[in-house]
Amino acid sequence: QEAEFNDICDCHGSNVGDVFSRYLGDDIIGARSLNFTKGTKLLMQLDEWCNYIFPGIAVRVEKTGSQMYKLKMRNDVAPNVGFGITYALPILVSGLTIPEGGMLIVENPEAHLHAKAQSNMGYFLARMAAAGVRVIIETHSEHIVNGIRRMIVERKTEMSHEDMTIYFFQNKNEEKDIIEIT
């Protein structure tokens, strides 16, 4: 099945607003949901995950036209959060909206994130995998891996260490070694 125009975020996070507005009223349930304290709708779950990864951050939507929305981030804590939210938002929206069985490929999800936020991003990506999304991550961050491991250890889903494979790529004498770490 072909995706409709602006139905998915591309590798640069483009179309995140279109994707968000398209699925705004959808329920996010099961392993994808962090909890239900604010509700099950996409906006509420995006707000929960943003606050989990970036404590003190709140997501709000303002309707600016018949089919136009403005996504606003409110920061109650730090005045200089940086670019981390900008890089994380497309990952969060993609993870929450991609269909079960779909594939989410993420390059350097740790970009511009503090160590704790990196770990929480790994946790988020593991929860998406537990919900049936095929997740491929290219990372240099042990914190991302530790977040994935933490999700498995907490046993909040049926996912186990056997459902995850980590590969370490190493250049040796102009040859590439691929080492499986599980």
Residue ranges of model-derived segments:
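C-terminal lobe/lid and adjacent interdomain/linker elements of RecA-like ASCE P-loop ATPase modules
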Residues: 120-182
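The start of beta-strands in P-loop NTPase/AAA+ ATPase cores
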Residues: 102-103
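Phosphate-coordinating catalytic segments in nucleotide- and nucleic-acid-processing enzymes
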Residues: 1-88, 94, 99, 182
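Generic hydrophobic alpha-helical scaffold/packing signal
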Residues: 47, 82, 92, 122-126, ...
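Short, charged/polar micro-motifs that form catalytic or ligand-binding hotspots
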Residues: 36, 78, 111-112, 134-138
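Walker B catalytic motif
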Residues: 106-109
